[in-house]
C-alpha cells in the first residue's frame, strides 16, 4: 500500500543555493581585499602627511630664525649709521662756521642744531630700547605665529584622521548592511525549506489518512506491536503497528496476549502439533487397513463377529476421516491466515519504517531549522544593535567635526 510521493527523493535546497553562496563568498573576499588596500593607502597617506607637516614645521622654524637674524642685523646697521651721522654732522658744521663768516642769526641756528645732537648716548640707548622692544614683539609674534601654525597643522591632521575614521565607519556600516542582506537571504532560504518540509509533512499526513481509510474500507484491524521479533529494548519502538483481517485478528486473539511474533510462534506450534496428530491418525488408519486386509481370509464361521468388528471399524474409520478432514480444513485455513498475516506484516512493516524514517527526518530538520532561525534572529538583532551604535558614533563624530571646523574658522578669523 503506497502513498503519493513516499518513494521520491527531493533535491536538497542547499545544493540549489551553493552557486549563490559561492558568488557571495567571492564578493565578500573581493570587498575585504579592497578594504585592506584602502586601509593601506590611507596609512601611507597619513605617514606622508605627517612627514610633510614635520617638514613644514622645520621650514617654519628655520624661516623664523632667518627672519629674526636678518631683522637684528638690519637694526644694528641702522643704529650704527645713525650713530655715525650724529658724530660726523657737528664737526662739519663747526668747520664751516670757522672758515666762512656768517651773520648772527646763522650762528645762533647752528648753535641750536649742535645742541640738539650733542647727546648721542641718549639717542642710542633709546634706539636700543626700541630695538629690544621690537625684537620682543617680533619674537612674541613669531612664537604665536608658530603656535597657531602648529595648531592649524594639528587641526588639519585631526580633521584628516576624523575623515579616515568616518570613512572606516561608513565602510563598516556598508559591511554590516551587506551581512544583514546575506542573513536576510539565508533566512528566506530557511523559510523556503520550512515551507517545503511543511508540504512534505502534509503529504505524509495525507498518506496516513488514506491508509486509515483503506484499512477501514477493507475491514482490517490494527494490532500494535511494541517489541518486534521478540526482543526486549530499553526504549520502546514508536509507531510499530500491523493491519490484519478480522479473522486473523480473532486467530491472534485466541493465541493469547503478547507481541505479534510470539503469538505467531504459538500458532506455528499449534500447527505443528496438528500436523503431528494428522500423521499419527494416518498411521493408525494404515494399520487398521492392514488389519482389515489380514482379516479378510478368515473362516465364514467368524463372519458374524467379523461383521460386528467391521461395523465397529467402519465407525472408527468414519470418525477418523471426519477428524482428518476437520484437521485438514483447519490446517489449510491456518496456513492461509499465516501467509496472509506474514504478507501483511512485511508490507506494513516496510510502510511503517518508511513513515517513521520520514517523520523522524522531518522532525530533525524542523528542529534544526528552528534553531537556525533563532540563531539568525539573534545575529540580526546583534547586527541591528551594532548598526545603531555605529550610527550614534557617526553622528557624534560628525558633531565633533563640525565643532572643530567652527573652532578652526574662529582661529582663522582671529589671525
Swiss-Prot record:
Region Disordered: start-end pairs: 1-20, 52-130
InterPro entries: LRRFIP1/2
Key words of the record: Coiled coil, Phosphoprotein, Wnt signaling pathway
Biased composition (Polar residues): 88-117
Superkingdom of this protein's organism: Eukaryota
Residue list for modification Phosphothreonine: 114
Gene Ontology process terms (BP): MyD88-dependent toll-like receptor 4 signaling pathway; MyD88-independent toll-like receptor signaling pathway; positive regulation of tumor necrosis factor production; regulation of DNA-templated transcription; Wnt signaling pathway
Phosphoserine found at: 18, 92, 95, 103, 107, 111, 115-116
Coiled coil: 22-49, 121-217, 260-408
Biased composition (Basic and acidic residues): 52-61, 73-83
Functional note: May function as activator of the canonical Wnt signaling pathway, in association with DVL3, upstream of CTNNB1/beta-catenin. Positively regulates Toll-like receptor (TLR) signaling in response to agonist probably by competing with the negative FLII regulator for MYD88-binding.
Family, per entry: Belongs to the LRRFIP family.
PANTHER family xrefs: LEUCINE RICH REPEAT IN FLII INTERACTING PROTEIN, LEUCINE-RICH REPEAT FLIGHTLESS-INTERACTING PROTEIN 2
Assembly notes: Interacts with DVL3 and FLII. Weakly interacts with MYD88 in resting cells. Following LPS-stimulation, the interaction with MYD88 is rapidly enhanced; the complex gradually dissociates to basal levels after 6 hours of stimulation. Interaction with MYD88 is regulated by LPS-induced phosphorylation. In the presence of LPS, competes with FLII for MYD88-binding.
Protein name (Swiss-Prot/TrEMBL): Leucine-rich repeat flightless-interacting protein 2
Organism of this sequence: Mus musculus (Mouse)
Lineage, highest ranks first: Eukaryota, Metazoa, Chordata, Craniata, Vertebrata
Gene assigned in the entry: Lrrfip2
